[in-house]
Amino acid sequence: MSVIRPAAPHDVPAILQMIHDLALYEKEPDAVRNTPELLTEVLFGENPRVFATMAENASGEVRGFALWFLNYSTWEGVHGIYLEDLYVRPEARGEGHGKALLQHLAATAVDRGYARVEWSVLDWNEPSINFYKKLGAAPMEEWSTFRLAGAALAAFGAPRLVSGTLTGADPGAGALAGSPADSRGAAARG
């Protein structure tokens, strides 16, 4: 049995540990720069735009989590949910926690009138791909994910900064400060 609940500030150490565990599984053990302070601020600060949902067993032990935020479909005219991370501890896999977390996000989307729940998965992660397909999710074969990050982001973005303003920018570009963004890139249009 899986108990699903919103994350609370006391969950931050467990969430951060599972983020590190996920990075290790995804062969990027040194890529995590997140800290308890950053995670606490983004999840529980004054105006949170990123959310975490916890899965526990009947004894109250944390078995997994989902970290997600809203995206927007220009074609549908409504929000969707982007699932940034879904992680279930290895010893708890097969107990229904991952399915329960995804069902909770799907129910949240349905209840709020959102258009979809979407996420990215590494192409070599066959166990997850098969799990998602069994739930009825389908890969978006015609889409490729692009990302600007690190040096490429700095090189591309720096020339536009002149005296603290964006030159040639869209008038709404200033609204980007603090807006929710997919750290894995703009994975889907619409």
Where are these regions (language model features)?
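Terminal substrate-recognition subdomain of acyl/acetyltransferases
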Residues: 134-135, 144-172, 176-190
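A short, internal acetyl-CoA/4′-phosphopantetheine-binding micro-motif in the GNAT/acyltransferase core
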Residues: 86-93
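Conserved GNAT acetyl-CoA-binding A-motif
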Residues: 110-120
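Conserved GNAT-fold acetyl-CoA-binding loop/helix
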Residues: 16-41
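Conserved active-site alpha-helix within GNAT-family acetyltransferase domains
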Residues: 99, 103, 111, 123-142, ...
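Conserved beta-strand in the GNAT
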Residues: 54, 61-70, 82
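A short beta-loop-alpha structural element at the N-terminal edge
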Residues: 3-15
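A short helix-loop-beta-strand connector motif used in the catalytic cores of GNAT acetyltransferases and
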Residues: 41-54, 82
